[in-house]
């Protein structure tokens, strides 16, 4: 720090004004003020002391006071500009920490801030969570530091955890990588595991899935030895607890300690419904069970300040713009929750008007909405809020009164001060701002009210709203008016009966911000922080009452005060005892003067009563009884070798609440053991399954051609058994009524809210699948957020829909955030306007005029991007003239501000982590592509010399889920001869290599390209074999890649067809150009919403095609199946059949494409097939659908009879099995699952992308069903590097269909200057080998193809290069070894996660599809060409195969496939890998290479999107 700056700061901090000298027995408190230039953030007392710290955020400094704020000094041990965050140790009154950012060195004090020492955390503090430090409750030296390692600045950051056991006296040690927050189990003094060694060492970490950045894939891991290797094999000691009794749960998003409870919150894909799990020892866990009419959703529940014997939670039950809730209280183990009070008042931040009275058990105050029904009907209606209090822990509530009038108090939702709202440790003293009357009035009309009997009775204090504090155990009440200019404080020395005023010194006037004192309210000193008149003027006012009275209270000045009394003033019992405090009498003329000594209650046990008992484990209260909801826990040895009707002494259903101290009376007790039958100790044995398929048809009246249908899906961990589908019959001109089913089509009804409504389009939320929006052309929208249980509505801004654009855009994390793009008309002109809402349509703000489209590009998966980022394409100037160019405009603050990023663009699309923009190149009259990761900076793409893009007019963006953009570049084409190349980018989307040429496409630039769902890097394409012979019809062949497009091979043909007959041609095992299996691709698909594979059926894939030298006519095609991800295929049916996957792949269903009355299904992966008739006469099956995850055992057939009537048939296969499959990890024969590993056809070791992954699949001979979602990746082993882990580098290409990469004809390898310029932070360039590592490969050692050549220094990095590559010095050798290991180990893993998905890749094949109405008419431009033209010369097709993304989205309608609704260009989340690229990773810290940390943060996966031209339409 500069000396001058230090002196100025010191002078400023010590420039203070005394108002009154400290004289004995003064009539008023003493004041001392300090003037500041910046607000004193984060002001904190060291507990039980007058020592205070605050931080100056503007200067990055810490200041300290030893006299309760009277004087201040600057902490000189911390250099100016370093202090970023001040953290107090919650369990040690002498320790505090100052964190720096950026930086890996931080500061600590162990002597209340007198001295500070720096410590090495070896990582930066994480920017992704607030709880940087996690403290051990009983050992202050044990601290966990949640940090992050970053690559390329803060572009790709991964969270890591460090720890110390000596209070950072020595450097922090590495705990675990790939974390999302770690904490000690013993994070609360009340919590215990029951074992001293576990209390000391046990750590819980939320761990990011190795393959995914999705919060829905995070898991909870526990370790008792700091996640260290427990043996020489390097296996980390950690285990995953069974959160749901018998099985682990994925999707863990938060862990919190509440008193003696440990709470874990988990989320699932497709929904914002949450699951809560509770433990009081980390050993036994329970799912928190709420009444069935209320679910726990993200951002809709608040864990309140709970007790030592129960958890209290408030759950929002209404619309977020005007929220209300219901408060629940659990039993003592946190399992079952019962309703306390309805219509609690909440705000949109999740704050609830609830507060317990400090130090008194069983008393808390709440505000509720008195006109709840009115507010529910009118979301803009004004709440009429009333205050109530309970004295029996929420069993009953009663009004609050002052002067015989009802009193209402402003509470937590209107916080105006630090700390608690009403009470403090001062026994029985409570204050609040409010008013008397029928309900709570506005804040400005409030006055101060006081109670000295814990809220039973109240008196009025000073008029107007005030900040207030308690001192000297309640002897002093201090208040300051909440106003713009205040020059006095008010105080009372007799519990608020009388008030005096004291002027601030030197005519000082401030706007009060904070009034505070010590945590225990035992001090006579207070601190007031206020804002002065001038700009950047703040004041700290120290207020001292210690000189006002000489007398110290004697015993005669004290009284006994009972915390809870009944109407007659008699002490009442709670938790088996009464509670009494010794406190100063109201009118005593003395101070207690027991600083830093907390009041301690006296208790007296009561005789036990019914309220001292609760329902026992596996029992639930039903009125006045406890009923069994599970199995009875039998004592050890009971029922061993006994019959089901034999008895034992077991629980009565009741137990004494743990911690209850009541005295038992003589005689029978409520929890006495009773006779129980042994059959009650186990679940009833299920009866034998029927083995039958249930068929339930439903007729839709009228003449129709097809159906529009949408699945409203649920989360994987949802307890809801319903399967909801919305459908309506349609024809070319109109649509019928909307129907809804909750049982997958067995019964249907018309929702009253939608009956006879003219619905233009149905839009399902692509991220939160329980939501659907029913859009009318006027802009009125009806919607449901709970699978059709309830319906709401809003009016969109503007003048209705624009039929040429999708009206709604959704945010991936916030279900209430929406963008509406509609028509806005002013005078004689109309244009598109984009408006934004944060409360699901209640309020709108215009963000852009003359807009083409907008997308939310911010997401929790993109840690390198602003979460509030929106990108829009907007006309460069307003007006309706043709050919006005568009600009790419982005905003990182929800369009409070915005900036033009690219000019003259045609369109943009998002794909995985990439944003790709197509802009017009006016010189070449063609398109030019740009790519961005952060949405702010865009780099031009560079294509290899063997790819001609000089006159490019269209690009199709294919699946890009593996840290690389896959771009289809069409070749100059003749009519019906569209072919092109697939180019694959590097990890930042800028440098491309050719993956494969001659790929088939159609005139709309849709491509025969298919990704296999769930598995990484398995791709199918169709190429045109005779592309040089332009006069011949196309001869197409199918190729498959198991290396993400690095190498290709033919599909191996089966030997015999479905009838056992030999095929006419034979080939090698892997197929060749003369004989192979060929599959009809995306360009021939009538329904672009169908996929070959399913997210839930790993390794399984169907296809329709033929065996031969080329692909034949589809009329001659048969149906084929692979169960090993394309390594081998078998013919399962003659002819072309449709397929669907059920029960996560254990049920496969087929139906003929011709008229039929039967379906065929298999439960053994196609070894045997069974037929089932679903109707009496052959009908046209328009479609067969099920849930997108493939996890249901119900299917729907959508059919049309010859008389043009339509109907749907539910096929229920639950009768095939009624026992849930079980996984037994250590007993393969007992387990119903086996570990299946995909393999590479060219590798004998089953390695793919540098590792061998094992997936759980149900054994085909087991008669059970998959009750729960199967663990996606069971385990993974890392492999050595081989050729299959590398692909051709920039300007190199495969030599034929071979394995060698050669320089493209006429091309030059990338020069050292070009490579170093593209990688400015790298020091070393290797002469090109022709190869580069596949970004998702995790291989280590072995044969390294990309950097075995000669190395050279990058310009400007010569010294660094010499240090790395210089002579044989020990340190240099050490660096070389480290860099080599870092380059080999820090490589990307990308396993695409699609368990709740409907599609992945440019070809979106889900298990459902739909048709639409007018905009779905075959003559409609939406169907004819899913494009948007932008100019006559150079245009860019805008909408395209990019549907609603990959991962957890299902394929909905063809409309969605084109992106008319629900997220063109905006994907869902993808998976997290360990880095990529051929260069060595440059880590933030010196030992990061040893940690196994990832290089990539959130990655988004999406489907293909077409960027091209079309001259048929204009904008």
From Swiss-Prot:
Residues 683-698 have a biased composition (Polar residues). Residues 1392-1426 are cytoplasmic. It is found in: Golgi apparatus, trans-Golgi network membrane; Prevacuolar compartment membrane. Pfam families: Sortilin-Vps10, Sortilin_C. The keyword Protein biosynthesis does not apply. Residues 1-24 form the signal peptide. GO terms for cellular component: cytosol; Golgi apparatus; membrane. Residues 25-1370, 1448-1515 are lumenal. Residues 1498-1515 have a biased composition (Acidic residues). It is a multi-pass membrane protein. Residues 673-698, 1494-1515 are annotated as: Disordered. The keyword Membrane applies. The chain crosses the membrane at residues 1371-1391, 1427-1447. It comes from the Eukaryota. Residues 673-682 have a biased composition (Basic and acidic residues). One of its GO terms (biological process) is Golgi to vacuole transport. Glycans are attached at residues 333, 692, 699, 988, 1173, 1227, 1347. BNR repeats lie at residues 64-73, 107-117, 449-458, 491-500, 739-749, 836-845, 1040-1050, 1120-1130, 1161-1170. Belongs to the VPS10-related sortilin family. Functions as a sorting receptor in the Golgi compartment required for the intracellular sorting and delivery of soluble vacuolar proteins, like carboxypeptidase Y (CPY) and proteinase A. Executes multiple rounds of sorting by cycling between the late Golgi and a prevacuolar endosome-like compartment. This is Vacuolar protein sorting/targeting protein 10. It comes from Pyricularia oryzae (strain 70-15 / ATCC MYA-4617 / FGSC 8958) (Rice blast fungus).
């Amino acid at each position: 720090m500069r000396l001058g700056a230090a002196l100025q700061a010191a002078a400023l901090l010590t420039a203070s004004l005394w108002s009154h000298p400290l004289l004995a027995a003064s009539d008023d408190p003493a004041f001392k003020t300090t003037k500041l230039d910046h607000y004193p953030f984060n002001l904190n007392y060291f507990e039980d002391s007058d020592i205070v710290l605050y931080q100056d955020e503007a200067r990055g400094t810490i200041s300290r006071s030893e006299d309760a704020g009277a004087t201040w000094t600057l902490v000189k041990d911390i250099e100016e500009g370093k202090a970023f965050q001040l953290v107090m140790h919650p369990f040690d009154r002498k320790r505090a920490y100052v964190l720096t950012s950026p930086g890996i060195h931080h500061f600590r004090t162990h002597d209340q801030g007198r001295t500070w020492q720096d410590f090495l955390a070896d990582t930066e503090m994480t920017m992704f969570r607030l709880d940087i430090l996690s403290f051990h409750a009983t050992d202050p030296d044990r601290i966990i530091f949640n940090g992050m390692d970053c690559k390329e600045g803060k572009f790709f950051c991964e969270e890591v955890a460090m720890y110390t056991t000596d209070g950072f006296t020595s450097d922090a040690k590495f705990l675990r990588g790939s974390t999302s927050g770690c904490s000690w189990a013993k994070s609360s003094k009340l919590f215990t595991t029951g074992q001293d060694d576990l209390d000391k060492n046990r750590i819980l970490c939320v761990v990011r899935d190795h393959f995914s950045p999705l919060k829905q894939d995070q898991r909870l891991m526990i370790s008792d030895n700091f996640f260290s290797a427990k043996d020489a094999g390097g296996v980390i000691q950690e285990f995953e607890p069974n959160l749901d009794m018998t099985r682990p749960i994925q999707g863990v998003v938060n862990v919190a300690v509440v008193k003696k409870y440990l709470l874990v919150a988990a989320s699932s894909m497709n929904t914002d419904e949450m699951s809560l799990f509770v433990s009081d020892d980390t050993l036994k866990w329970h799912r928190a069970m709420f009444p069935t009419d209320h679910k726990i959703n993200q951002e809709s529940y608040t864990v309140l300040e709970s007790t030592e014997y129960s958890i209290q939670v408030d759950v929002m039950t209404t619309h977020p713009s005007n929220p209300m809730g219901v408060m629940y209280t659990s039993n003592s183990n946190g399992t079952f929750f019962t309703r306390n009070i309805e219509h609690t008042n909440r705000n949109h931040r999740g704050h609830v008007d609830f507060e317990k009275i400090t130090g008194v058990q069983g008393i808390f105050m709440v505000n509720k909405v008195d006109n709840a029904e009115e507010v529910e009907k009118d979301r803009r209606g004004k709440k009429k809020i009333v205050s109530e209090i309970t004295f029996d822990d929420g069993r009953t509530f009663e009004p609050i009164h002052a002067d015989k009038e009802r009193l209402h108090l402003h509470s937590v939702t209107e916080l105006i001060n630090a700390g608690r709202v009403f009470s403090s440790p001062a026994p029985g003293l409570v204050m609040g701002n409010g008013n008397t009357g029928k309900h709570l009035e506005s804040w400005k009309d409030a006055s101060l009210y006081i109670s000295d009997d814990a809220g039973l009775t109240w008196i009025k204090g000073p008029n107007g709203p005030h900040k207030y504090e308690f001192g000297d155990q309640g002897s002093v009440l201090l208040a300051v008016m909440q106003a713009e200019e205040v020059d006095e404080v008010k105080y009372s020395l007799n519990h608020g009966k009388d008030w005096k005023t004291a002027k601030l010194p030197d005519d000082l006037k401030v706007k009060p911000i904070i009034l505070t004192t010590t945590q225990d309210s035992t001090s006579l000193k207070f601190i007031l922080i206020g804002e002065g008149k001038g700009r950047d003027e703040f004041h700290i006012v120290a207020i001292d009452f210690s000189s006002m009275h000489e007398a110290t209270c004697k015993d005669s000045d004290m009284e006994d005060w009972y915390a809870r009394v009944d109407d007659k003033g008699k002490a009442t019992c709670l938790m088996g005892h009464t509670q009494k405090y010794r406190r100063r009498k109201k009118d005593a003329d003395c101070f207690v003067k027991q600083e830093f000594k907390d009041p301690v209650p006296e208790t007296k046990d009561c005789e036990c009563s019914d309220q001292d008992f609760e329902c026992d484990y596996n029992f639930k209260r039903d009125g006045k009884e406890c009923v069994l909801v599970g199995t009875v826990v039998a004592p050890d040895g009971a029922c061993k070798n006994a019959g089901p009707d034999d008895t034992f002494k077991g629980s009565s259903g009741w137990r004494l609440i743990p911690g209850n101290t009541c005295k038992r009376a003589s005689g029978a007790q409520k929890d006495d053991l009773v006779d129980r039958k042994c059959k009650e100790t186990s679940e009833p044995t299920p009866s034998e399954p029927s083995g039958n398929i249930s068929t339930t048809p439903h007729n839709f009246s009228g003449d129709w051609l097809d159906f529009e249908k949408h699945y409203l899906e649920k989360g994987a961990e949802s307890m809801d058994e319903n399967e909801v589908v919305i459908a309506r019959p349609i024809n070319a001109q109109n649509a019928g009524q909307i129907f809804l089913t909750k049982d997958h089509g067995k019964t249907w009804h018309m929702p009253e809210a939608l009956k006879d409504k003219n619905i233009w389009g149905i839009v399902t939320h692509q991220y939160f699948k329980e939501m659907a929006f029913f859009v009318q052309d006027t802009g009125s929208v009806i919607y449901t957020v709970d699978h059709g249980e309830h319906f709401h509505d809003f009016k969109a801004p503007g003048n209705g829909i624009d039929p040429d654009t999708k009206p709604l855009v959704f945010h991936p994390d916030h279900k209430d955030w929406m963008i509406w793009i509609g028509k806005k008309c002013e005078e004689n002109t109309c244009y598109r306007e984009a408006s934004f809402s944060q409360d699901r349509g209640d309020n709108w703000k215009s963000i852009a005029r003359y807009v083409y489209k907008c997308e939310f590009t911010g997401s929790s998966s993109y840690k390198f991007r602003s979460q509030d980022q929106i990108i829009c394409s907007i006309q460069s100037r307003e007006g309706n003239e043709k050919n006005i160019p568009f600009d790419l405009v982005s905003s990182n603050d929800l369009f409070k501000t915005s900036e033009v990023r690219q000019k003259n663009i045609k369109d943009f699309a998002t794909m995985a982590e990439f944003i790709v923009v197509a802009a017009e190149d006016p010189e070449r009259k063609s398109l030019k592509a740009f790519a961005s990761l952060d949405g702010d900076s865009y780099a031009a793409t560079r294509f290899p010399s063997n790819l001609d893009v000089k006159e490019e007019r269209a690009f199709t963006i294919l699946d890009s889920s593996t840290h690389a953009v896959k771009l289809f570049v069409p070749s100059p084409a003749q009519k019906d001869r569209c072919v092109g190349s697939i180019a694959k980018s590097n990890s930042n989307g800028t440098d491309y290599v050719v993956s494969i040429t001659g790929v088939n496409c159609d005139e709309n630039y849709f491509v025969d390209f298919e990704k296999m769902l769930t598995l990484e890097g398995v791709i199918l394409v169709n190429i045109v074999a005779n592309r040089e012979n332009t006069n011949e019809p196309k001869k197409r062949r199918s190729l498959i890649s198991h290396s993400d497009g690095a190498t290709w091979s033919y599909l191996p043909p089966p030997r015999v067809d479905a009838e056992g007959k030999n095929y006419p041609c034979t080939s090698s095992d892997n197929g060749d150009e003369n004989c192979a299996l060929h599959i009809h691709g995306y360009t021939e698909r009538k329904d672009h919403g169908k996929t070959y594979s399913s997210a839930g059926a790993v390794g399984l894939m169907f296809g329709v095609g033929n065996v031969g030298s080329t692909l034949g006519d589809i009329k001659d095609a048969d149906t084929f199946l692979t169960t090993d991800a394309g390594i081998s295929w078998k013919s399962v049916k003659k002819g072309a059949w449709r397929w669907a996957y059920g029960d996560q792949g254990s049920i496969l269903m087929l139906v003929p494409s011709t008229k039929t009355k039967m379906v065929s299904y298999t439960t053994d992966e196609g070894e045997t097939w069974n037929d089932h008739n679903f109707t009496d006469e052959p009908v046209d099956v328009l479609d067969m659908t099920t849930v997108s995850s493939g996890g249901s055992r119900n299917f729907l057939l959508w059919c049309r009879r010859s008389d043009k009537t339509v109907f749907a048939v539910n096929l229920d296969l639950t009768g095939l099995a009624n026992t849930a499959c079980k996984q037994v990890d250590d007993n393969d024969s007992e387990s119903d699952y086996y570990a299946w590993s995909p393999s590479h056809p060219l590798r004998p070791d089953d390695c793919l992308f540098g590792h061998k992954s094992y997936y759980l699949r149900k054994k085909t001979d087991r008669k059970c069903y998959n009750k729960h979602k199967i663990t996606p990746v069971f385990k993974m082993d890392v492999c050595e590097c081989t050729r299959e882990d590398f692909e051709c580098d920039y300007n190199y290409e495969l030599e034929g269909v071979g394995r060698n990469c050669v320089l493209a004809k006429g091309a030059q390898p990338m020069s050292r200057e070009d490579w170093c310029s593209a990688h400015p932070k790298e020091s070393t360039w290797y002469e090109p080998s022709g190869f580069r590592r596949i970004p998702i490969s995790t291989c280590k050692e072995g044969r390294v193809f990309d950097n075995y050549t000669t190395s050279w220094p990058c310009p400007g990095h010569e010294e660094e290069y010499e240090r790395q590559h210089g002579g044989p010095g020990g340190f240099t050798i050490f660096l070389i070894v480290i860099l080599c290991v870092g380059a080999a180990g820090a490589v990307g893993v990308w396993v695409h996660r699609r368990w709740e998905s409907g599609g992945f890749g440019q070809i979106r094949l889900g298990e459902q599809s739909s048709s639409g109405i007018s905009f779905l008419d075959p003559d409609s431009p939406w169907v004819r060409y899913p494009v948007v033209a932008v100019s006559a010369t150079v245009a860019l097709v805008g909408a395209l195969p990019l549907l609603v993304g990959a991962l957890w989205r299902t394929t909905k309608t063809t409309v969605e496939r084109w992106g008319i609704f629900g997220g063109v260009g905006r994907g869902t989340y993808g998976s997290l890998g360990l880095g990529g690229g051929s260069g060595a990773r440059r880590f933030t810290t010196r030992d990061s290479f040893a940690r196994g940390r990832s290089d990539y943060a959130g990655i988004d996966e999406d489907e293909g999107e077409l960027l091209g031209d079309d001259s048929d339409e204009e904008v």
